[in-house]
Regions:
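Short acidic/polar inter-strand loop motif in beta-rich domains
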Residues: 98-109, 138
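Glycine-centered loop-to-beta-strand initiation motif
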Residues: 70-84, 93
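A short, solvent-exposed beta-strand micro-motif common in secreted/extracellular proteins
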Residues: 88-99
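Beta-strand-rich domain onsets/edges
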Residues: 2-48, 56, 63, 138-140, ...
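Extracellular Ig-like/FN3 beta-sandwich strand-entry sites
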Residues: 31, 86-90, 124
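Beta-strand signatures of extracellular beta-sandwich domains
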Residues: 51-55, 92-94
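Surface-exposed loop/edge segments in extracytoplasmic proteins
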Residues: 60-68
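Extracellular beta-sheet/turn segments enriched in Thr/Pro/Gly and aliphatic residues
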Residues: 113-149
Length: 149
């Protein structure tokens, strides 16, 4: 049990170091209010080609699909939504983890991983969602930054 806890701690530390932005005002992020970064905890490497879908909750509490994409070789997705399209509200990002693990030759427990969050509750912000992924668990965190000036 102690070895597993140490592994999770080390993997989380590595993931946070990899997910930290080097240049907070990078050209690709200027008009990109929602970024995603995924790390495959088994390989200790970015999880490329993970499909994801972004939904926004309507006034009637139903979910409307507003964007979709796949992670690149670096395990990242940029330009999912423009600043103009990323309106205040509740969002759900659904990651197709089952398909990813099947392509890796592994069986997984979860069909999808989900992150539900409220955007712009305290003014306009930029969000980076980070996902640490293994076949039987996932951990998420978010880096929330102010609007680029």
């Amino acid at each position: 049990m102690a070895k597993a806890s140490i592994f999770v701690l080390l993997a989380s530390t590595l993931f946070c170091c990899q997910a930290a932005p080097v240049d907070r005002h990078a050209v690709s992020d200027v008009h990109c209010p929602l970024n995603v970064k995924i790390l495959d905890a088994l390989r200790g490497a970015p999880a490329g080609n993970v499909a994801l879908t972004v939904f926004r909750q309507g006034a009637d509490k139903t979910w409307e699909k507003v964007a979709s994409g796949n992670t690149n070789i670096a395990g990242e997705v940029h330009e999912l939504l423009s600043d103009q399209d990323f309106k205040p509200g509740v969002y759900r990002v659904e990651f197709d983890t089952k398909t990813y693990w099947k392509a890796e030759g592994r069986t997984s427990f979860h069909e999808v991983a989900e992150v539900v969050f409220e955007a712009h509750a305290e003014g306009h912000h930029h969000y980076t969602l980070a996902l640490l992924l293994s076949p039987f668990s996932y951990t998420t965190t978010a880096v929330v930054g102010k609007e680029h000036e």
